Each structure stands twice: as structure tokens, then as C-alpha cells.
Amino acid sequence: MSELPVTHLNFNQDTSCVALGLMTGYKIVNIQLKFGKCCCYNDDSINLIEMLYTTSLIVMTPLGNEIGSSPRELKIKNTKTNSTICSLFFPTTILNIKLTRDHLIVVLENQIYIYEIKTMKLLQTIKTDSNPLGLCAVSYDQETNLLAFPSPPKAKDALASMRSSSGNAKSTHAAGTSHNSHNGANKGTVFKGDLILFDLNKFQPIMAISAHKNDIAAVAFSADGTLISTASHKGTIVRVFDTNTGVKLFQFRRGSYPTKIYSLQFSLDNKYVLATSSSMTVHIFRLGEDEALETKHKKRIKTINEEPSAVAAAAIAAAREASNNGGETTTTTTAAAATSGPRENGGEDDDSDSMDDDLDVDDDDDNEDDCDDDDDETPVKQRKLSQGSSNSYASINSEDINSPVIDQNRLSVARIIRRQSQNLGRKAAQKMGDYLPSRFSSILEPTRHFASIKVEAKHKDVKSIATINNSQHDIISLQYDSRDNMDANLLQINVVTSEGMLYIYGLDSERGGDCILLNLYSLIDE
């Protein structure tokens, strides 16, 4: 990261602005209505920076390179006057900060501090297990008002014995069916990819979601707080859960080879999820509305209600009691508090070993299929609809307006071969989908991304974040059939990188496929 000019990059809550932490201060750029309007300030080298919508309030932490600065210090500043409102010091390095209209959340490796933003009164301190990435997410909707953070790892056989002796107390976790929860499990198997959902209105943990078997690398709430998306350290699977029930609504295969997921981002209308990764690809997953999935989710909820977990309910109750005991402001998240009740089999498909493909220059086109999907019987309709959610490769000479967009600049022999192979699998799945169990049809036809982007970076280890908006610039791409078609269907993808570049891509909301580069800007040049 020493070669890169940007030390930290972050969108504000409504993704209208981007804040850049620099070695010489920070910069805020409006990337929507008043595109190009920016504020630049000279300061210490910045480690973290967080905006509060488009207000003049920002929160930052320094890298600590300068004399007198420390990564344990948090500064709240007014950008209009470039003055420091207040400064706080913490016992260890600050790993993450989040701002809402009501709260300031500061994440350390083993603690989370929650402050009231108006008075800076400390409202709650949550003790957590080791969280070296400072991973957390906040819903900005004041009604849902949730905080998510990783739960401590726990042993699977210990959970089984605890559940068997806990009676039939009501469970607060609803992450799916438990028909394959413990089949074939080895003693001492540890699950690391669980999330705690914490209510910021009641200051109580309300749910533990079994998201992945591996450690979680990225997590994000939707704008209304009703959905949460996760990815593990392996980076091959992206999942979307309902925050009200904990039920897994969607599962997508990003690729087959491990990569680091840098960020997840929902569109404001909850129709898409974007994932950026160390392979410099951006994957766009479409959250389709088919009734077959709804039927599957209702069956899972019913199963959960019939087989509740007493351990989760008891742990949550204990945490609430500790939170309300004599005005205590500390909640300790233990392994029991993170107990997630019935566990989905879907969490185990992150662990299949795979080898890097030397021919693979475009990670979004990996061809290894997901052979560890849920064992639940998937309706035929879902298997057929999943074809529309995959980035199928149409013939270059095809004039089908519904076929995915193909970027000629990304064309390669390896890519064509992989896509032809995937098309054969999909055709086989369509022909035999009515006769094969869903587990086998999912091998032939996994649910993949709807569209993708390959960002051309000049350096290695370039981080990126991305967001999706309606088209706002009159930039015509020759890749589209007509101006009218472009205007009707075009969505705008903004990708910001730690090289200080803003890339603007066009996504055809009907066809998907490759997103076309419309323009690019340098955000750090004067």
C-alpha cells in the first residue's frame, strides 16, 4: 500500500460522496448530483475516515506516522471550519468506525464502543472475541437500526450436547433447516463464520446467523436494514440473509478460486448486490423475485419453529440481563451468546479445495461449480430462473437483444472456452432438471453473477469499492444498440480504487453481462 496514494476509501451512507484518506490529509468528492465538487484538507496521514451523509461532520483516525499522532486516537471534525470538535483515545488501535444519525460506533480488536452522537455519551461497550479486521456493519435505517459483527468461534459437538440438555426454550435464531446440521460432523469442529445482530435501539443481541464455515471477510446491510450480505475469507460464495428471520434468501458463486473480498454493497432498491475483490473484478448479483424461493424459505422457517434451540434463547436472555443489570454498559459476547440454533448445510461449501488456473486471467469467469449447495429440494422454477442470473456467454454474432452484453476488450480464448463449457452444463441442466435432484442440477447450473466488471489497475494490491445508481451522465457507449435502449435500461456502476481513480461503468439492467466503461476520473489530481 506504500505505492498507493489512497490509504482508505469509503462511501457515505447514501453513496452520494466518497471520502478518501491520504498520506497528506483527506479529500471528499461528490460523485452524484454535483459531480466533481470536492473538499480537500491537509492533515496527518489518515488511517480511517467516515462521513455522516453530506453534513460537515466527519470522523477519522490517523495512521500514526507523525509525531504526536496515534492510531488509537479518534477525531471528530467539522469540514466547514476544518476544526476538531472532540478527540478520544482508546486502549488499542482503532480498526473500524461507523456513523449513523444517532450513534458513533468504534471497533477495536476485542471491543466495540457505542456512543450517542449528539452528546458523545458512552452508551454500550460490547466485549467480543478477536476481530483483527474490525469487521462490522450498521443499518442506517432508524427503524431497523442494527449492528452486525462476527461471533466467537464455537465447537460443533459442544453445541449438540448443550442443545440436547437445554429443553425446548424458544430460539431467536432462524438460519435455515437443521436436517443436516450434525450429520458426519467430527468432534471439535469449529465454526467461525457466524454473525451477531445487535439491536441499537434496545441495546440487545437479537440473533446469531450461521453465514459461513470460514471466517467472514465482508458484511453489509441493505439501505432499509432488511437484508444482510456476507462473504467468507475464501471469497467464493456470497450470501444474502433476511435480518428479521435469519433465513438465507440467496446464495451466489462469485468464483471457484480463493480471493479476498474487499466490499459488499446493496443497491438502494435491494435488486442487486455488488462485490469487489483483490482480483480487481466487480461482480453484480441480481436478487430475483421468484415465488419458488419464497416457498423454500417458508418451509425453512416452519422447520426452525418446530426445532427451536434453547441455548441461543438462554444466551440472548443472559446478555440482555447483563445489559440491563444496574445500568451496566458492558455486554460480553460469549460462545453461548453466539449460538445460532439449527445450522444450514450451506455454510460448508466454502471449504472445498481448488487450484489456481494458470489460464484464468479473469477471475469472474471461473468454471468450477458449487457442489455443496443446500440439500433442500429446489423447485424446478428456481433452477430454470437461475439461468437468467448467470453471466452466460452468447455468440458474438448473436442479434438476440436479451443476450448478455459482451465487452470486446475482455475477449480471450480461455474465456470463450469456459463460457462454452458453462453453456453445455446449463443446457444439460435444463434438459434433465425435472429428473435430477436439486443437488445434482445445481452442480450443472450454479447461480452466478448477473454482470461483471474487470478494472484495469496499474498497481498490485489495489483496493476498490463500488456502488450502483441510475444513469446520471450523458455518456453514450457504442456497445449499446441504440441511445433509446441505453437510456431505458442503463444503470451506472461507480468503482473507486485506492489508486485514486473513479471508474464509471454502464450496466444493462435487462441483459447483464459485461459492464461497459463509460468514463474515468482521477479523484486525487487537482
UniProtKB/Swiss-Prot annotation:
One of its GO terms (cellular component) is phagophore. Residues 385-397 have a biased composition (Polar residues). A motif (L/FRRG motif) lies at residues 252-256. GO terms for biological process: cytoplasm to vacuole targeting by the Cvt pathway; late endosome to vacuole transport; pexophagy; piecemeal microautophagy of the nucleus; positive regulation of vacuole organization; vacuolar protein processing. WD repeats lie at residues 211-251, 256-295, 470-515. Residues 162-185, 321-397 are annotated as: Disordered. It is a peripheral membrane protein. It holds the Pfam family PROPPIN. This is Autophagy-related protein 18.
